[in-house]
Swiss-Prot record:
Signal peptide: none annotated. This is UvrABC system protein B. The gene is uvrB. The keyword NAD does not apply. CDD domains: DEXHc_UvrB, SF2_C_UvrB. Residues 430-596 form the Helicase C-terminal domain. It comes from Bacillus cereus (strain ATCC 10987 / NRS 248).
Amino acid sequence: MERQFEIVSAYSPQGDQPVAIEKLVEGINSGKKKQVLLGATGTGKTFTISNVIKEVQKPTLVMAHNKTLAGQLYSELKDFFPNNAVEYFVSYYDYYQPEAYVPQTDTFIEKDAQINDEIDKLRHSATSALFERDDVIIVASVSCIYGLGSPEEYRELVVSLRVGMEKDRNQLLRELVDVQYGRNDIDFKRGTFRVRGDVVEIFPASLDEHCIRIEFFGDEIDRIREVNALTGEVLAERDHVAIFPASHFVTREEKMKVAIENIEKELEERLKELNDNGKLLEAQRIEQRTRYDLEMMREMGFCSGIENYSRHLTLRPAGATPYTLLDYFPKDFLIVMDESHVSVPQVRAMYNGDQARKQVLVDHGFRLPSALDNRPLTFDEFEEKTNQVIYVSATPGPYELEQSPEVIEQIIRPTGLLDPPIDIRPIEGQIDDLLGEIQDRIAKNERVLITTLTKKMSEDLTDYLKDVGIKVNYLHSEVKTLERIEIIRDLRLGKFDVLVGINLLREGLDIPEVSLVAILDADKEGFLRSERSLIQTIGRAARNENGRVIMYADRITRSMEIAIEETKRRRSIQEAYNEEHGITPKTIQKGVRDVIRATTAAEETETYEATPAKKMTKKEREKTIAKMEAEMKEAAKALDFERAAELRDLLLELKAEG
């Protein structure tokens, strides 16, 4: 029986969620390729999308523009769909330095990477789920458009085992080695197997605590059990088990032979070209590197950086579209692009950045030209591979609006909170005027955000406010993660009342205590004063019932006009709904920790901040680092990726300052 998507939640759709859900579902069922959901901040967009997935019952790829956001969405969707396969697919590098060459200084930078084993397991879990069931939601970062091995090979090389099946034990061991499993009778971990007489234990790449025990009787599989890899406790009896490859870049032996021949052929052509052009150093370099890789591939079926030969391994012609996660989905699937105003431009930019770096490596003999085909999709290729897409954003970009002129709106917040009213005031005397407003807010125990255009103005304003006795702090791009956490928490706790910054659009600044957002130089057109940036900045005051925005400007620009009109329009819709349903807006009451846990490191990090790294003794620093590393691994294991990512950043800073 097919499994169905099923939401488990105490809430039912409210406000304009039911209409948005109905329209999106109608669009998908009628075959619309692209739709836009314009959801204001705090209106429950994830819940709406969850209901759409439940209604249309299609495997879904949710794309986010960074790992932190992907982690948040993954946690939310896992809560809504506890009985379905909600998977997580992001780059598995904790640290990644791609190989690169700087011709000016003749510096070659080797690829250096630290792979997060937990995330690698989740990636394997995601791809294997797509082949085993239909009720799959994969939350991915934009890096999912990077090349992956062939889904056909991945599927065909699955080792399928059943009770009663005739199978020679040694034949099974050979098959496991062919799909990149290594024999290890001592250090038993993911991607390995061990043998004890007639018993073979396999640790699948997609699991982290359970392994599969295969018991043979002669040449027949007598029993299959799922056991705890650490304690050996039997968890379940199985009739059938599918062991998926331990790498996404797996290739059959006969294909590998053809690939090696083709790589050798390309190498000969490239050597001739380089020698004819007098590039002897480059020729020697490419020959040495490629021959070493070929030797490894012959002996082990694998080599470091094998993805650079992916075109040959999948027997694709030059310039052909690479396989990616999108190819692992069935044809009829749904894509949700979260924060599409950021994620769509990211997809566009990825290909060009990748090609520029690789071309230098090819020109200087570090890689064969075929390495250029190990790449992310171009935007056109991405478009071709998509089936049906929902773009989700509070401020959809021009591309999305062009693709789907009819926008589905979600404006009403379940809390009844309104978009803030906006005042426009002249620049002359703005600081004195602002000072009066700040003092009003302080008297009510509320907070203020001020956004300026330049670093100098931020610094001068902060100094001035300090001089007149206001408790103020300044947030700029050079503030490290560690300090940023403290600053946001201290603002919420009331250790200071005003936060000044240039770009206040970053995650983590949705603070319910903020009742005033002041935008200085609102009439200076540019990235930070575009209509989208202004709408996003105005949204920072939408978490408080007394929220208000003041724009200081001598003229009204087109961007200001659009942002003000849009905010007024949303506010009038919200007011009408509240009046009709007798709702009184109430400021969100959130413990300081709630907000911070989702966006920055949690309160516990206070212990790490007590002594600045520079003042710690070597022993204290080592102890703190060890403690944080253990906590980071625990957080990743508990799927609290925001916390793990934050701890990783803190660790990097601590090590750098040591």
